[in-house]
């Protein structure tokens, strides 16, 4: 079956054409990330043991009401930010005795950079701040016989990227892509570790970019649990005391510790079933003769909840014991986790209402596309169901493609907009934990041809990019043989003479050794033949008297 792909923001819409017949149809498939995950590894055993202890909770909530969830409706977030940093790239090239070549994997290390260095390069190479200057993904190859050659080059990288907006203070703050820090919009520049950011302070947007798209009936538990537990998908807002209240244009909204933008609508006296999670909170109309039944049903639901929670903990234990070839995203209660191949875990936070940033931005190694989720910009690898925090934005590695995972299949934007799918495979609409068919979340259609053209333009632009290293060095480590080198006096004439010295000496040694072995074998064979002849004796036979003589 051949399917033509059309991308929805984060759904795939396919016009299905079965090649063996005339049946046509359309299906949608969600391909967006569900969570953003920390790079920090944690002990999975300790987390699993804690998992069971976290399954118990209070039977009665403190109050109940509605949680309104908000999604970012801004087309591109905040202003374009130009990031500057210095990087040192190392790569080892090996030539063996048998003239084979081994190319090592490049390694990157971020160095300190000054504002003056960044400004000088931006003025000369990208004065409009539309910059895409990146260190090469691989260094020029350099080989020396029977040696390891470590090539080291330093580069200044300047990259333009989108940003998100924060409304946690009266003055707007911006958060650059993949950054954990926010900066005052009016500052025009900021520094995070070894990265320096620049942006235009004239950006002005007085409208709040967040719009409500869902409401959920929830139960609120005060300290020590300090959380909101909602119906539908069992999503949880933890540590509500630590939520941040937004101000300015977004006054009244709150941002949870996991990044969700929400508004709490307290309804303690509501008898509507959808205004709470378990609909068992006591009120005047349900008091009296139904009090006992209320308590019994609450106990039963609490037992069911604890059983489900323990089952999820057991599933996590099974995943940790299984043989995994890749990292696995799983959900335990209201939390997402990535389980590594080595049985460590990384904690994740849910993402809601993600959209592709326009104009499109891309990164390489691995290939990623920029997305915006509740006010923050991330670079997402479409082969994964989650976003990795804190990754560098490097050049694309030659020959690689931008690949989306479509169910159990992979679709490369670089290809001809068609993908082979099994004829009898069933497809449906896949959502994240908060999506429903009635929600008002934005699903802007993304033309796959437009995305493909942007990706190919990005590849062509990087192909034309010319960047000179700030400094370069190399270190050649020769594989010295265990004998005195009679030609070492030639090393002063230059490195190429030293290479020739090694080649001549090593191969002369090899041939001399082989010659000695052959000569030794010949001498041994001659000695063995001589010894064999000395063991033979000549015997003269005289005729006997009884012999007859014929006449």
Swiss-Prot record:
Glycosylated by host. Glycosylation is crucial for glycoprotein export at the cell surface. Its main location: virion. Homotrimer. Interacts with matrix protein. This is Glycoprotein. One of its GO terms (biological process) is virion attachment to host cell. It is found in: Virion membrane. Belongs to the cytorhabdovirus glycoprotein family. The chain crosses the membrane at residues 504-524. It comes from Lettuce necrotic yellows virus (isolate 318) (LNYV). It is a single-pass type I membrane protein. Attaches the virus to host cellular receptor, inducing endocytosis of the virion. In the endosome, the acidic pH induces conformational changes in the glycoprotein trimer, which trigger fusion between virus and cell membrane. One of its GO terms (cellular component) is membrane. Coiled coil: none annotated. Residues 1-25 form the signal peptide. Residues 26-503 are virion surface. The gene is G. It comes from the Viruses. Keywords: Glycoprotein, Host-virus interaction, Membrane, Signal, Transmembrane, Transmembrane helix, Viral attachment to host cell, Viral envelope protein, Virion, Virus entry into host cell.
